[in-house]
Amino acid sequence: MRILTVIILLLIVVPGCNEDNRPQIPYVYVNVTLYPNTMDYINTMGYKYVNAGYRGIVVFRISQDLFMVYERCCPYDPEKTGAKITVDPSNVTCVDSVCMSKFILTDGTPFGGPSPYSLMQYHWTYDGDALYIYN
């Protein structure tokens, strides 16, 4: 009887141990094509805002063939009205307009402010001409 009680308690307690309490950014379908070498020109170590996603997208070009694509909604409190990341003048970091969390654009990790969460990334492929962004 004692073993049965322990097993039942473990079945109740253990599944709750791995619960992810990270706030969820609402899902919005994304399928965008950019031409970073022509009309949508993006310099190396430069960026472009795109009107897509939940609160917008920022495309950061690390090198000729390497991009990082992030949701502009802050992962700390996605439901906060007006919360949107903007790239700072250094073009290396960005900051949320409400909670003031700061993120590194090369990998999306937080380095200041209250957010312990990285920026949400979108998938992308680049064929040398077109940059396809999707989720």
Positions of PLM-derived features:
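Polybasic, low-complexity RNA-engagement segments
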Residues: 114
